[in-house]
């Protein structure tokens, strides 16, 4: 299986889906079990550290998530410009309880337009004032044409984005939005990640 997995990654895939050979092993969308298992690249590689990012927006969900958000737009903080710059859209790692809790926590902070301190190319369906910090993990930091963290600082017309972001389950109530992971810290993480790969 490991050789199939490595070949899939080399071919640009996210990973493998492994299926049981039992007769009752049928795919059921949105259902979790052990008859079909995802074996993804980010399960094998991950950031050296987690990121504490600020919720600045949300995108509508579909299907079972229609009553909540599908993903949250997350940002780092840049103290030099006093701006929150996008790093990822995160939609995995959330439990049913998290959806309800986040809906309650963010409701009072919803605003009509993008906050003036938010630097985003993406247009969220819902905007929030920078308020809530969440701990996020992922596979790696990559150059991004849509995220504004480190925009033009590493490559022209590119920022840095987090691949395969996932909520760790940790709410950082101990941090203000300005205490979130900084743009400078993310640039350093990206540069260290490149050194490790080489």
Residue ranges and their predicted role:
Residues 116-122:
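Short catalytic/ligand-gating loop segments at beta-alpha or beta-beta junctions
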Residues 1-112, 123-126, 133-184:
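Nucleic-acid 5′ end/cap handling module spanning
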Residues 179-198:
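Acidic, low-complexity intrinsically disordered tails
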């Amino acid at each position: 299986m490991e050789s199939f997995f490595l070949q899939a990654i080399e071919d640009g895939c996210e990973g493998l889906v492994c299926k049981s050979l039992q007769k009752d092993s049928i795919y059921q969308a949105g259902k979790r079990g052990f008859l079909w298992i995802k074996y993804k690249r980010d399960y094998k590689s991950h950031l050296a550290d987690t990121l504490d990012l600020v919720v600045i927006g949300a995108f509508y969900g579909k299907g079972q998530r229609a009553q909540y958000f599908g993903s949250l737009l997350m940002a780092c903080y840049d103290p030099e410009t006093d701006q929150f710059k996008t790093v990822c859209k995160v939609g995995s790692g959330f439990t049913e309880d998290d959806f309800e809790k986040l809906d309650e926590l963010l409701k009072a902070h919803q605003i009509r337009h993008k906050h003036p301190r938010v630097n985003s190319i993406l247009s969220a369906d819902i905007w929030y004032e920078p308020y809530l910090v969440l701990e996020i993990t992922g596979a790696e930091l990559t150059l991004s044409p849509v995220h504004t963290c480190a925009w033009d600082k590493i490559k022209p017309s590119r920022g840095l984005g987090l691949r395969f972001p996932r909520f760790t389950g940790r709410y950082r109530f101990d941090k203000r939005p300005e205490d979130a992971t900084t743009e400078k810290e993310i640039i350093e993480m990206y540069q260290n990640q490149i050194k490790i790969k080489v």
